[in-house]
Amino acid sequence: MLLRFTKMHGLGNDFMVLDLVSQHAHIQPKHAKQWGDRHTGVGFDQLLIVEAPNNPEVDFRYRIFNADGSEVEQCGNGARCFARFVLDKRLTAKKRIRVETKSGIIVLDVQNDGQVSVDMGPPRFIPAEIPFVADAQALNYPLEVDGQLHSIAAVSMGNPHAVLRVDDVQTAPVHELGPKIENHPRFPQRVNAGFIQVIDRHRANLRVWERGAGETQACGTGACAAAVAAISQGWMDSPVSLDLPGGRLHIEWAGPGKPVMMTGPAVRVYEGQVRL
């Protein structure tokens, strides 16, 4: 059978989006891996699936697969594309959309200028909830990699993140250190690794090595986690503008227990069909 899909991106973080509200199919990890190949498939960082909700209090269910076939809990850039997609496809007429994910409910607001704001919910710092192996909760933790200690912040934005402060993101060892942090035994579900360079109280540069995808042009949850870590440690103040390789995201966070608000673009690239 043929399935209709839309290729989208948020700051270069690219997605294949499938509507399984008006189409019916059983998507398995092998499909994500097959379609995610940039040489022989569609090619993407993540596959986003729009489904009818299980919960009557939300509008849609949102599922995410990485290009390696692993299903993950959350994707911030994908959430913005999800909101733009369901409006463009007339699956809803609402500008404020409640969505069920593996890690909870998020709220998407589509603005008149085309930008999308996402209420990502409050960050979580308790090690067991990230999950991260630590004796006690702290603002930062020493993490040993290849005999060297690195100071990291550990945060969950519905998915696990490690955040490291660096002097210059251009020269940071993202491709060497990123996969080693991703697969570090202290992160039992693996982790996304963010490398942040603070410019001033409200601006920073960021690169993210994503769990199951490698370095991407932008990572929405990674930007949220980096902003939360920087504000928590006193390096920065809300609101924060983060420049990633693919462009800029705006993050607001009022402190512990408060939701993280992320605003950025969502772009449709093309429509296509793929054989299941």
Swiss-Prot record:
Catalyzes the stereoinversion of LL-2,6-diaminopimelate (L,L-DAP) to meso-diaminopimelate (meso-DAP), a precursor of L-lysine and an essential component of the bacterial peptidoglycan. Its EC number is 5.1.1.7. The record marks 270 as: Important for dimerization. It holds the Pfam family DAP_epimerase. SUPFAM superfamilies: Diaminopimelate epimerase-like. Homodimer. The keyword Isomerase applies. The record marks 161, 210 as: Could be important to modulate the pK values of the two catalytic cysteine residues. The keyword RNA-binding does not apply. One of its GO terms (molecular function) is diaminopimelate epimerase activity. GO terms for cellular component: cytosol. This is Diaminopimelate epimerase. Keywords: Amino-acid biosynthesis, Cytoplasm, Isomerase, Lysine biosynthesis. GO terms for biological process: lysine biosynthetic process via diaminopimelate. Pathway: Amino-acid biosynthesis; L-lysine biosynthesis via DAP pathway; DL-2,6-diaminopimelate from LL-2,6-diaminopimelate: step 1/1. Belongs to the diaminopimelate epimerase family. PANTHER family: DIAMINOPIMELATE EPIMERASE, DIAMINOPIMELATE EPIMERASE, CHLOROPLASTIC. It is found in: Cytoplasm. Substrate binds at residues 13, 46, 66, 76-77, 159, 192, 210-211, 220-221. Gene3D superfamilies: Diaminopimelate Epimerase, Chain A, domain 1. It comes from Pseudomonas putida (strain ATCC 47054 / DSM 6125 / CFBP 8728 / NCIMB 11950 / KT2440). InterPro entries: DAP_epimerase_AS, DAP_epimerase_DapF.
